[in-house]
């Protein structure tokens, strides 16, 4: 007995000491980016067998922990994984507070109950579009092109057809350095990370080495802007830092001596996952199906994000793009009576010694996000961009019927400087059974563009012309450009600038458990062109969205846009601003647990107060009111995961853009240039399943079909003179966990494809390459 008592005493002391040593705890609650509580999140402690899930309020707690260092791992289907490092002392109760899980928009946008993913469908827009509501419930047609389809199609930049994946979008003429994209009959401004960076001849087309996704927003969009064309806009979202370690190297080679290398690295720089980084780099050297049209491209895009606290995040993102190319080399010219496409598709109007152009674009984004609580957050964003260009452009002075041409070269130096600031708040609250998602903020834009294209001259002479039917290259004398004066001080020169100040407020009101959503919003804008008067405009936005069934949502939209009108009549009076108004209705569907996503929309866009030159004014200084342009049509988009092996992307658009009202006789009914009445695109991707002998292999096939195309400008006969356009592309690929090898063939049928227009002196067009291919190898390091 005397021996047992000491043993029991030691055992008692050991047990009580152990209990005291294991009375620490850690807890928190988990929310989504919309500040909704996340239940059923899997939460584990590294190096232990502890595992729990969060409750309906997103809460979790680990109790009876020893002092020491722990790593808390959080995971949930459809969300990015997250790890949090904590250090606990004896008897410490640590509250981590609010923990944010970000949706994995790059990887798990649509997942079925069987874990099958719709690779081409996206549930949400990016945070840069400010909207908290899923795409299916938004009262507007918004389509998202993700990195998955860009990889399948081996697209390398915006000029190569990323727009084919969205209904009704087409690429109009360009100078080889920027994407001239039209939709619903109007030019689309280019946005990048939620900022309108459109310029007079820009921006430099984004390369896919830095692109995460491209969002096409159709029609006026007051939640982003009011000053602009009414067709909509496209928003390029660049790659951002992530907690998960990423690393990949891509090598590509293709027709016309195209060689390309890109790399993508990222992950956490600290053990507590507070400092994240990403680096994307690119080098490309490419030829063309036309002679003497080589180009070189370099890109660097580093970014950092830092978690200042549990409620505050900071993001900084830098990008540098450099392009060397020959501007104007894409154009082909011919006499009026010869017809479009009358010269071979590889024909070149330029010589090897034509002066080339260097373009540099530098941008810096700084973004601060603060979450006050579960329902309210604010975000401030500052972006600055500098675009410089030094070079020349090639054009045509004259064309004779026998093919004798006088070509010209003019200087094209340019500087574009721009600054942007955005401050926006998002919030959620209830008034009884009615929910409210509110958003409001301020936008500031300051852009200036300077250019010199007034120096130049002919490179051919009447006695020594360039004949398009018997071309002789070389032996030409080029004008010498005087760059001794800084560009901004040169005379004559071209300059343009604009300042925009605007405020916006929106309330999305949810009824019947948010099955019906009414959006009431408005934007007040002050737009001041450089050296001109300020245009002030209030534009309302009204949207209605209703869940007819869990699979079908119906919506309607009314919104407005405007453009400053600098035209004056012969009495010196200025015309009213050009106004755009949209009426849109549609259906959005989601079938088979996300396997099939489709949308159908119909719209009418009216663009008022359009002017044209006064025919009675020989000076061409004055204008008269042309009237109203009406764009109407319907559009269909579908992204489908038909089986576990088969993915399909399909779209169709019917677009009709005409003058609807006019004071000018015979103008009503005139077709507006820059669109095709019918556009349909398809892309099919088949991956052999894991049990197949061809495991890892896949094939792709796609088409683009444009019917009843207008030229870039409509002729006096009010007829489109371009033939229908049909192109077929395909590819084959193999992949495993580390490696992906792909071979794509474009224009399989070797069609002579082109688009163009004419003036009163000659035709001009741009051709696409015949059958061509590229092979890509991507190696994943992790």
Role assignments for model-derived ranges:
Residues 369-373, 377-383, 388-393, 579-641, ...:
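Membrane-embedded beta-barrel scaffold of Gram-negative outer-membrane proteins
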Residues 210-212, 223-300, 308-312, 362, ...:
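Outer-membrane beta-barrel translocator/receptor signature
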Residues 515, 625-713, 776-780:
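Gram-negative outer-membrane beta-barrel transporters
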Residues 309, 416-418, 435-439, 443-447, ...:
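Structural signature of Gram-negative outer-membrane beta-barrels, strongest in the C-terminal barrel
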Residues 7, 648, 704-714, 733-782:
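C-terminal beta-signal and adjacent terminal beta-strands/loops
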Residues 31-33, 41-46, 75-79, 89, ...:
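Short, acidic, small-residue-rich periplasmic hinge/interaction motif at the N-terminus
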Residues 284, 288, 301-371, 386-416, ...:
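Acidic/polar loop-and-plug regions of large Gram-negative outer-membrane beta-barrel proteins
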Residues 171, 179-180, 196-218, 236-238:
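Short acidic/polar hinge/loop motifs at secondary-structure boundaries
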């Amino acid at each position: 007995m005397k021996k047992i008592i000491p043993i029991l005493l030691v055992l008692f002391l050991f047990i009580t000491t152990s209990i005291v040593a294991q009375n620490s705890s850690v807890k928190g609650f988990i929310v989504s980016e919309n500040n909704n509580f996340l239940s059923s999140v899997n939460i584990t402690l590294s190096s232990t067998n502890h595992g729990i899930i969060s409750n309906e309020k997103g809460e979790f707690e680990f109790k009876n922990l020893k002092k020491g260092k722990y790593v808390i791992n959080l995971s949930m289907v459809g969300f990015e994984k997250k790890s949090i490092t904590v250090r606990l002392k004896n008897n410490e109760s640590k509250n981590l507070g609010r923990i944010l899980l970000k949706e994995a928009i790059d990887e798990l946008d649509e997942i079925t109950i069987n874990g099958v993913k719709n690779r081409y469908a996206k549930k949400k827009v990016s945070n840069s579009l400010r909207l908290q509501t899923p795409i299916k419930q938004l009262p507007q047609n918004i389509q998202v092109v993700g990195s998955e389809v860009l990889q399948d199609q081996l697209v390398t930049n915006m000029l190569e057809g990323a727009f084919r994946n969205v209904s009704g979008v087409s690429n109009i003429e360009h100078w080889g350095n920027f994407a001239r994209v039209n939709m619903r009959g109007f030019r689309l401004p280019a946005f990048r990370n939620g900022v309108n960076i459109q310029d007079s001849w820009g921006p430099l087309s984004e390369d896919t080495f830095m692109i995460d996704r491209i969002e096409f927003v159709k029609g006026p969009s007051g939640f982003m802007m009011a000053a602009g064309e009414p067709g909509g806009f496209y928003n390029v979202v660049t790659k951002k830092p992530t907690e998960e370690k990423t690393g990949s190297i891509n090598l590509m080679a293709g027709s016309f001596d195209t060689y390309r290398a890109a790399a993508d690295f990222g992950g956490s720089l600290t053990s507590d996952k507070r400092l994240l980084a990403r680096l994307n780099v690119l080098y490309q050297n490419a030829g063309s199906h036309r002679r003497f049209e080589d180009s070189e491209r370099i890109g660097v895009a580093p970014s950092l994000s830092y978690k200042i606290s549990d409620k505050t995040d900071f993001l900084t993102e830098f990008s540098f793009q450099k392009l060397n190319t020959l501007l104007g080399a894409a154009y082909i010219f011919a006499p009026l009576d010869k017809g479009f496409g009358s010269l071979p598709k590889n024909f070149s109007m330029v010589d090897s010694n034509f002066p080339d152009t260097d373009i540099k674009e530098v941008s810096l984004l700084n973004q601060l996000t603060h979450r006050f609580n579960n329902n309210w957050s604010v975000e401030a964003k500052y972006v600055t961009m500098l675009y410089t260009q030094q070079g020349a452009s090639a054009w045509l002075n004259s064309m004779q019927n026998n093919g004798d041409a006088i070509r010209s070269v003019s200087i094209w130096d340019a500087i574009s400087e721009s600054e942007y600031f955005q401050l926006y708040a998002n919030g959620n609250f209830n008034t009884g059974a009615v929910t409210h998602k509110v958003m409001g903020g301020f936008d500031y834009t300051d852009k200036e563009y300077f250019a010199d294209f007034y120096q130049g001259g002919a490179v051919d002479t009447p006695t020594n012309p360039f004949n398009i039917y018997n071309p002789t290259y070389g032996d030409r004398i080029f004008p010498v450009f005087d760059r001794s004066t800084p560009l901004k001080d040169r005379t004559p020169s071209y300059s343009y600038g604009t300042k925009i100040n605007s405020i916006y407020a929106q309330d999305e009101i949810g009824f019947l458990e948010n099955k019906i959503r009414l959006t009431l919003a408005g934007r007040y804008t002050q737009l001041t062109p450089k050296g001109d008067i300020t245009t002030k405009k209030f534009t309302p936005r009204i949207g209605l969205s209703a869940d007819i069934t869990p699979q079908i949502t119906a919506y309607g939209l009314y919104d407005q846009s405007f453009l400053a009108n600098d035209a004056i009549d012969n009495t010196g009076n200025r015309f009213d601003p050009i106004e755009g108004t949209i009426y849109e209705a549609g259906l959005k569907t989601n079938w088979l647990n996300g396997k099939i996503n489709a949308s159908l929309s119909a719209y009418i866009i009216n663009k008022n107060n359009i002017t044209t030159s006064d025919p009675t004014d020989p000076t061409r200084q004055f204008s008269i009111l042309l009237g109203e342009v009406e764009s109407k049509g319907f559009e269909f988009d579908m992204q489908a995961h038909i089986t576990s092996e088969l993915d399909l992307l399909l779209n169709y658009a019917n677009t009709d853009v005409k003058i609807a009202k006019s004071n000018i006789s015979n103008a009503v009914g005139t077709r507006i240039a820059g669109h095709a009445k019918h556009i349909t695109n398809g892309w099919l991707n088949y991956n052999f399943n894991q049990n197949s002998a061809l495991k890892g292999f896949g094939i792709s096939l796609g088409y683009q079909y444009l019917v009843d195309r207008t030229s870039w400008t409509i002729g006096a006969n009010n007829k489109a003179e371009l033939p229908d356009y049909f192109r077929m592309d395909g590819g084959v690929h193999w992949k495993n966990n580390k490696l992906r090898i792909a071979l794509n063939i474009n224009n399989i049928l070797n069609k002579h494809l082109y688009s163009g227009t004419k003036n009163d002196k000659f035709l001009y067009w741009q051709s696409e390459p015949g059958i061509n291919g590229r092979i890509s190898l991507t190696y994943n390091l992790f």
